[in-house]
Amino acid sequence: MNTNEIMSTIKMIEEQKLDIRTITMGISLRDCCSFNGEESRKRIYDKITRYAQDLVRVGEEIERDYGIPIINKRISVTPISMIAESSDDKDYVEYAKTLDRAAKAVGVNLIGGFSALVHKGCTKGDKILLQSIPEALHTTDIVCSSVNVGSSKTGINMNAVKQMGHIIKDVANLSASTNGMECMKLVVFANAIEDNPFMAGAFHGVGEAECVINVGISGPGVVKASLEKVKGEPFDVVAETIKKTAFRITRAGQLVAREASKKLDVPFGIIDLSLAPTPAVGDSVARIIEEIGVEACGAPGTTAALALLNDAVKKGGIMAASHVGGLSGAFIPVSEDEGMIAAVKSGALNLEKLEAMTCVCSVGLDMIAVPGDTPAETISGIIADEAAIGVINNKTTAVRIIPAIGMGVGDSVEFGGLFGTAPVMPVSKFSSADFINRGGRIPSPIHSFKN
């Protein structure tokens, strides 16, 4: 490396807020099944604390040795519905508490995998887990839950979509004293992926190895700073600039992943190329979109700008990493992005425009607060719309929505830390009840039949 490259990397970290958002250790719990729930939970606790005992220490060592901030150390596990259904337990709240205790024992920030994959239907374990979600999230601190309700191969399980609307409302009501904040630990997916290092949707897929290290990068501020140097240039130049910047960002992630894998003696899984914003000024995906040329995020042209950004990040990042996976693109979580928050407050960005943006970006409607009296059927309708985008376009989509109990449009929910502030956004006043109450399954699209 020449001196300019070294100085450029230092500048990315110190001035442009480049960081490694997460080192996530995925752990298989498939050998923790037992007909006795207590025995199963003991095996789960012992395995997590054994495999992850050095995760935080190693993350801090790498941060110190290389000077790259590593914001979170996390764990993902096999979906608990698959593990717990071997037992005769009638609810799985104790499994969530076990995950919580194990994660706290090793010092990680979050643990994901209180999850169920119900895109075609529910097993006994899936049904019990879904019923357990509200109490599980209410009685734990750092456990995250996810449910996959659709896939491009199987269509959309509308029975599960209906149920998730009610579950989200139940979670919100149990945390009414904090305006429904516990909902930020729950995400509903279509086309969920098995190697996601980001929360709340991370789980360790059944096709994964015994234990792996997945790394999620960040760096919206670096991309914006690069684009400031090409003001007024054609889109070709914009795309090339983003690609080159994404390459540099991803190289840092590859270095951290390789070192973590070596020090922990755990196989390297993937680098997730996602641009993950924070509420801090200068670390916003919305501000990148505005730098590309729209006056405010949400104005006409926003979706096209986001599509360009997402594609260029993938093209640049994929050349810098040996294995790419996860969600890999640009995140647009409203409460976690200073520019998104400003756009919503100014009226430039609404729920419908956000839905359009999810057609071309990494995930979906993320960290969105809606009025606390929003009907469960309306929430289910929002989930169904987002799932349809994912299923038809063969991409991952998701909904992480917070019914802000006791709040209305114009109020704001304060989450604090990386979770930021969510302005309460208006939703349609027209009912989706008759649509949601049909139940059944929406069939998979014609182009899903590829065999």
From Swiss-Prot:
CDD domains: RNR_PFL_like_DUF711. It comes from the Bacteria. InterPro entries: UPF0210 (IPR007841). Belongs to the UPF0210 family. Homodimer. This is UPF0210 protein CA_C0479.
